Amino acid sequence: MDATNDATLSQDERTAALREAIRGEAFPEWVPESNNHIHTCYSFSPYTPTHAALLARRAGLRVVGSVDHDSIAAAPEMTAATRALGMGSVTGFEIRARFDPDGPLDGRKLNNPDSAGIAYMTVQGVPAPARAAVDAWLAPKRQARLRRTLAMADEANTVLAGLGLEPFDPCSDMVAASQYAHGGGITERHLLAAMASALIRGFGRGPALVAGLGTMGVTVPAALAGALADPGNPHLVFDLLGVLKAEYLDRVYIQPTDELATADEVVAFADSVGAIATYAYLGDVSASPTGDKKAEKFEDDFLDELFDAMEAKGLRAVTYMPPRNTPAQLERVHRLAAAHGMLEISGVDINQPRQAFNCPELRRPEFAGLNEATWALVAHEALSSVDPALHLLGRTGRLGPDRLAQRIAQYAPLGRRIADGEAADRVAEDATRA
């Protein structure tokens, strides 16, 4: 195994392996792209933070960001790896929250296919000195999520037993396969990967697997039927996991309760540590690039109302994935973000090996602002690690659209200087407060 992607090694060992590996490697020219939404082995991903950074560099990206579920553990490694590669980094975490428990949006399907009223949020640009506080805040949420996931594993094993198949061992096949012992999170994908492996062992590979899924009532999308029936498919577990997430998870799913913060609490915590809380826009889905989401309606019917609620809760940023949305959806989100004075952050979910790190949409002129905002975030994280007062958006309050544009224009060049290797404390001398 490539040492940069060996999850059994320490973070220092992986970054040391990276520095050795890149000595003789010829990398491509930089492209005007970034990705601020990469999952690593500290939630669910085939990649360590070091290897994710390396793959991003091989794709020509200049900035990469990690947002693991309920975990900040990837941050120091991602930062060190990107520095070795001459890249910028933006680190944080992803979390689910009760968005509007006492308001009119409670019970609405937001950006979460599994739960009404519960939203995916990210907290990005976490200053390095705040990582310990972030980990302490997330730890009980990880523990509660593990308990719930173990209960769902019991439900999944009941299904397997009913099919006459050997169940999986939640401890060895799910928990031990994660980085939970090292501050990583446990997600439904860990559960479904264990279940997928058990189904493959039980039904066998090839057409027998597809036939077995049919006996479970699983609808296999036409686009994935060939891959699931291919006995030589090297990504079979990931492909089957995606189908199970879209088509079967609801049969074993237990709704989260005590592990959830409210959106207001997430915003307050992010502000307290100098990070930036965001709402992750999904939008109505017609077809999922990864096969893990069914065609379904999400926020678009009430998006104006949602942005009003986001502003009322103190959210100062929105993140979205340009490849997953239509031009009309993207234009509308951009217009609303500008009207509400919200920073726009781009990123493409990376959690399985078929996904490309590139986001060619960001090369289009209309998305130039997203690249500049990313560079401003690079500066924000590094500079606020030196001086908390150098927060891109200011520690509290909301910037007007013109002032926000000015801050991005000032901070983006500083982010590039940091990626070029200049010390953050030196760059901080040229930064101003919001």
What are the residue ranges of the model-derived segments?
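Outer-membrane beta-barrel translocator/channel fold
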Residues: 355-363
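Intrinsic low-complexity, glycine/proline- and repeat-rich
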Residues: 383-434
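Generic hydrophobic/packing signal
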Residues: 93, 125-127, 160
